[in-house]
Amino acid sequence: MISKGPAGWRIFLFNIFDHAPQLIKDFTWPEHLMKGFVKKYPMLFTGGASSVTHMHFDIDLSHILHTQFGGRKRVLMFPFEEQHKLYRKPFEVLSLADFSHYYETNGSPDYKQFPALKLANGFDFILEPGDTLFMPAGYWHHMEYLDSGFAMSLRALHPTLSGKLKGAWNLFGLRTIDTVMKKTMPKWWYENKKKRIFENAE
């Protein structure tokens, strides 16, 4: 952990239990809250102050319990239905807009380039050490480390068959198409996607 000064580095989706399996005894799975936890993959997230997780939603459409252990984190979240107002990239789970330091006067995003962002309805809050955030499947989230800190995410598969199938399609269909097109027709694919992004936001 970095204890002095801002550092934009972070480690994400790190399975700490592969390296220290004894830690699995230090917590219990909250199965009284929801079922379907992917117990093989509890993930650790660490970052220095000022590091950023850019606006996205999790590709597998899992429900997530995100517990902050150390440091504070600023979070911006939106329901999945706000995707076009957030300028979602087609065939991806990312936003074209940059939300870095959105809470500062001179921060992003660029509302002139992305005017529909002003119409998106979401949540803006700070996670303190000891807080646990529930993120429903498909929720968009952008996170900024206000301090050096670390957190852990527990994932639970979508409870419905349609949700599981959509998650599988995102992983193995959507992503494959995007990868192939980026390799075979990169310029055309980029321009086509960019055009669709702004058309969808209108």
Residue locations for each model-derived region?
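N-terminal accessory scaffold of Fe(II)-dependent oxygenases
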Residues: 1-132, 142-202
